[in-house]
Amino acid sequence: MTSVEKASKACELCRRKKIRCNRELPSCQNCIVYQEECHYSKRLKRSYSATKKKNGNPVLESAIPSLSPSPSIENGSAMLNSDITSLSNRIFKVEEKLDLILSLLKNSSEPLDRTERKDFPSLAMQIRDANSLVNTKLKEYSRRFELPSQKTSFDDLFSSTFPNFDAAFKDIPDKEWAFENVQWYFRYINCWWPVFYEKDFMDEYECLYRDRNQVKGAWLVSFYSVLALAASRSKAGKDQKLAESFFSTSWYLIQKPGFFLTPQLEKIQALLIMIQFAAHVSLHTLCKALCGQACLMIRDLNLHRESANADFSNKDAELRRRVFWICYIFEITTSLVFGTPSVLSDMDIDCEHPNYEYGRYFSEMPTGDLIFSSEVSLTILKNEVRTKVYSRTNTSNARNREKAIWQIHEKLLCWERALPIELRQYFIALTENAQIYEELDFEKQRLFSACIEVYLSYCNTLIFLHRLNESVEGANICLDTARRAINVLKFFFIIPIAKNVCYLWVFLYCPFTPFLVLFSNIVNGKEPSTDIAFEDLNRMYSVNRFFVKLRDIGGDLAEKLASVTENFIHAAENYFAVQPAFMADAFDFASFLT
């Protein structure tokens, strides 16, 4: 058999640093992190069998004398090899033709109700769909008013910039100041996203101020990222610059050689904290890159396999599980927003769910595990929506897709019924618009605020699920769910709970999803009731107010989405203005925002 040469799939940087390459185009994850151009050379690597044949066995070659074949034998052997190669090529081509014929026969035997495959509705795709709706449905009225039909690209929404190394904060901050900010992190962040055991982290903190050389570099990355998160909660300009400086220090530390070379649990923890801050300052492309690196380390450490925890104590095994599930939530939700393939969704996951008994080791707020466990279960269902409803196999047949939709719908209802009693009573209050926030104490207000975010995430999941449901019932579920979600924003979230908003809001429950449902319903003229149409427009204003409110909290992305929603509201107003049923009504954008 002839030797086979295989093309090397890794880029030049990954081959040079001897690290795993995920082979993404136009740039792999490692090149994004190291800020280098990604090049895939045409270099070939010879297979083991070919190398062995070329090099031979020196011991045997020296022991056996070489024989010089006659010219006639050489010519005959060459002709025989040529005939064998030609026959092999012809057989291979015949097999290809047979496979093609069989695939055509299989396709012709399938039902004729094949439907076009649709990708999962990423944020950029949702905005493009709304733009397309403006261009098609309102085109006949273009002479009467100017339409905001400018396109919003992926690069417009998600900045691809990276931190500036010149702003790195290289000195250890004051101990008392750092202590207050670390305590804030464990009370307000780590309780919902349990990345660290509080006691273990504080032990390293004390060690840092005794002797910096005794602290691991990965923990130092986490320390500066925690300070960046804590400092960013202040609206003062100097604190914002200080937060960016802390994060730049973390970014500088992970650029050191060897950080991505060997996978460690401490490094994954550091990357998770950096992801949270990057989302806060709208560096969402950096979120995706850091998430990819964390997933590679998870795969190398087998955190997704419960059998890998057998050699660890119960406490350490629980920490490994929680780190995996946090990364799972981040990676699945970011891939849905970006519309990119997920790494962890294709893996065989058998990791156990978080154990409530260990919640007290992560934060003084024991109810934080209620939110975290609910997010884990809901994210699993989100991934199931994409893999079963938006996959190639199920979208090729409308009946299969509708069956999958209702099966997952039943699972979502079971998820809601199985919520802990503390969360279920808040879900009921949110559905009924019951004003209970002021009646709660401070800790319960925090839990209620977090429950609102879970509720909005649940609503978005229902909308994504029934977006492809062609039945009337599915369309009604989408519309009713969108109205309930925006009602929550309007009555509960904007004032006074916006100050407690999660830094990952765009990935977990971006309100543009229900906004698009109401906008499409209005512009398509599907709402026969004038009063309900006015109420839906008012709800759209509430989404715009949400983004305006989050400009100081959510960075540039919230400001861009505020501008986008304002343009679409303007288009909906103009559509109303040319309809006979609405000619007598006037709209004032400012009146809805006061």
From Swiss-Prot:
**Principal localisation:** nucleus
Query: How far does the signal peptide extend, from start to end residue?
Result: none
Q: Which PANTHER family match?
A: TRANSCRIPTION FACTOR PDR1, ZN(II)2CYS6 TRANSCRIPTION FACTOR (EUROFUNG)
What are the TM regions of this chain, as residue ranges?
A: 503-523
Which PROSITE patterns does the entry link to?
Answer: ZN2_CY6_FUNGAL_1, ZN2_CY6_FUNGAL_2
Query: Which UniProt key words apply to this protein?
Result: DNA-binding, Membrane, Metal-binding, Nucleus, Transcription, Transcription regulation, Transmembrane, Transmembrane helix, Zinc
Q: What SMART domains does UniProt report for this protein, alphabetically?
A: Fungal_trans, GAL4
Q: Which InterPro entries is this protein grouped with? A: AtrR-like, Transcription_factor_dom_fun, Zn2-C6_fun-type_DNA-bd_sf, Zn2Cys6_DnaBD
Q: What one GO molecular function would you report for this record?
A: RNA polymerase II cis-regulatory region sequence-specific DNA binding
Give its localization.
Answer: Nucleus; Membrane
Q: Which organism is it from?
A: Schizosaccharomyces pombe (strain 972 / ATCC 24843) (Fission yeast)
A Pfam family the protein falls into: Zn_clus
Q: Has keyword Transcription regulation?
A: yes
What are its GO biological-process terms? DNA-templated transcription; positive regulation of transcription by RNA polymerase II; regulation of transcription by RNA polymerase II
Q: What is this protein called?
A: Uncharacterized transcriptional regulatory protein PB24D3.01
Look up and give the membrane topology term: Single-pass membrane protein
GO annotations of cellular component type: chromatin; membrane; nucleus
Write down the DNA-binding region ranges. Answer: 11-38
